[in-house]
Amino acid sequence: MQSPAVLVTSRRLQNAHTGLDLTVPQHQEVRGKMMSGHVEYQILVVTRLAAFKSAKHRPEDVVQFLVSKKYSEIEEFYQKLSSRYAAASLPPLPRKVLFVGESDIRERRAVFNEILRCVSKDAELAGSPELLEFLGTRSPGAAGLTSRDSSVLDGTDSQTGNDEEAFDFFEEQDQVAEEGPPVQSLKGEDAEESLEEEEALDPLGIMRSKKPKKHPKVAVKAKPSPRLTIFDEEVDPDEGLFGPGRKLSPQDPSEDVSSVDPLKLFDDPDLGGAIPLGDSLLLPAACESGGPTPSLSHRDASKELFRVEEDLDQILNLGAEPKPKPQLKPKPPVAAKPVIPRKPAVPPKAGPAEAVAGQQKPQEQIQAMDEMDILQYIQDHDTPAQAAPSLF
């Protein structure tokens, strides 16, 4: 905690018997991160007591300094005085409210002013160690002058008529805001003080919590890239990636000739140089033809690509593959109709003379037959008997 700035003043003490005057002339709102913040009440101390002076001050000098305290700190100091000095009659503390408004802050400042006036009038309370601790006199001497404290002190001196040390309080605050806080390097004791705990209070100034200070992280600035003027050409890293295709010429392999096709993205594969026409690696049909087979020109290919069918049935059937017709089963063969055996014809009845002549003819033929005729007769008459009769 930084010690208050102690300045010599020419104002007259109102409490000469105690040598101490305590007032609360104003308050200040301190904004924190996000929606947090608290109110500090500035206590003006005017005294000639040696406990508040440094070695450079004379015994008869009257000094003044400013101390900023929060509601919770003033409440703690009030409870200490009430518990130790029960005989002292002090005004009651202002009531606690959930939401603190401007009227509540003004009411608290007025009550704190009355309480500290009563403390400064009482000789026992004015020299109590609780008051010395509350006003921060454990570390004697002033270790620096803050712009806020000095401006308030000089503003109070201007009311007493001291023109040499008086200046405008609000003008000094504006100058400090424009100049900004000075940058100090943490060395030695400053490095140890940065490790101390700082107090974080709620917006009402009631609850207190301690948290360690965080070291500010030094951001490493990236090296800015050189700015290009209007005459400099920016190098495109992908310039050669999408350039026109290039291929080797059969006449001179060392020369690169740009391809005719502007849509080609990649170079032709390198096959080890151009191949002569009569090389044995080529197919015989290719050697005889003497050149590549003619292909469709670019315009014919475009016409074929953008051709639109006029027949609606053909357009609908473009994506569908023709289904093969199912093969018809062969009809079973029709069986032939069975041959109806014919009735043997009845020979006409012959007379007795004809019958006798007819009987004599076969007998003569039988007698005239030899062995071969008999065998042939048996074969002719035996074959139909062995064949199975067909139902169809």
Curated annotation (Swiss-Prot):
Pfam families: PX (PF00787). SUPFAM superfamilies: PX domain. The modification N-acetylmethionine is found at M1. GO terms for biological process: regulation of apoptotic process. Residues 138-162, 174-265, 319-364 are annotated as: Disordered. Binds HCLS1. Interacts with the SH3 domain of HCLS1 in vitro. This is HCLS1-binding protein 3. It comes from Homo sapiens (Human). The gene is HS1BP3.
